[in-house]
Amino acid sequence: MSEPIRVLVTGAAGQIAYSLLYSIGNGSVFGKDQPIILVLLDITPMMGVLDGVLMELQDCALPLLKDVIATDKEEIAFKDLDVAILVGSMPRRDGMERKDLLKANVKIFKCQGAALDKYAKKSVKVIVVGNPANTNCLTASKSAPSIPKENFSCLTRLDHNRAKAQIALKLGVTSDDVKNVIIWGNHSSTQYPDVNHAKVKLQAKEVGVYEAVKDDSWLKGEFITTVQQRGAAVIKARKLSSAMSAAKAICDHVRDIWFGTPEGEFVSMGIISDGNSYGVPDDLLYSFPVTIKDKTWKIVEGLPINDFSREKMDLTAKELAEEKETAFEFLSSA
């Protein structure tokens, strides 16, 4: 057995965490021979609920869980971390402007970035889930100058998985048969789900998605809006936001960081845009296609971008630049 790793989940009393913690504890994310010390952080009013989650994790009797720590204190939560999964954020309330939401979250992620900087290992991998995820991730990274910015990523894997699933449903295959879809940009309704480079396995051979679907207007229209608005559709139907699918996407994202991506496949995650070859301005936290090896991501370079894609990629970059500007105004005054 290897040494235990310390894994933090914030917002640990919430519903995404409730769907996520069992998978982390049972070895589905870090492997079946990796012991874990699981740290659960939430705000003080949630400590009663968190106690219940702690009891349930104990009652799961998971052999890999060496210890579970529930706390509302950052100095305990962020100490010596190997992995931080930042799920907790201020949710958008009725009548709340996006700007107000940004302001509330800048405060949270500035504090958590500073706590990572002060207490966590410098090699910590930080995954931001709480929305607005891209800008929250950038805020945390800026507030943790001693941790390499490449160690920060935000979740767009849920969008990626949604795009895969839509193509699979359209063609009557399993999601597993679809690979190399891309989510460009922001985890918001301006994101651009791109299948120009995606492949699908049909009758044992790989075919381009455009060739397989044979319906360009669907791929350039309804497919894109369905993926962009899927989160809202789930809320409308379930009266709660996506939790099971979000937790599954977090597992996929973190497992790929830990073990790497399969040969010939790439995945989507929000990462720092510095030095990309796709004309996205530097210093944005933007979702790109990446391959991962030795816990290090690399942007997939050299994919041809048509005019349709260019316009959509620029639009979501513009939104991210505006979010960043608003967030940084708050950051300097926070």
Curated annotation (Swiss-Prot):
**How does the annotation summarize its subunit structure?**
Homodimer.
**Residue numbers of N-acetylserine PTMs:** S2
Question: Sorted alphabetically, which InterPro entries does this protein's record hold?
Answer: L-lactate/malate_DH, Lactate/malate_DH_C, Lactate/malate_DH_N, Lactate_DH/Glyco_Ohase_4_C, Malate_DH_AS, Malate_DH_NAD-dep_euk, Malate_DH_type2, NAD(P)-bd_dom_sf
Q: Where does the record place the modification Phosphoserine?
A: S217, S241, S309, S332, S333
Q: Which organism does this sequence originate in?
A: Sus scrofa (Pig)
Protein encoded by which gene = MDH1
In Gene Ontology terms, what is a biological process of this protein? Answer: tricarboxylic acid cycle
Gene Ontology terms, cellular component aspect?
cytosol
State the protein's name.
Malate dehydrogenase, cytoplasmic
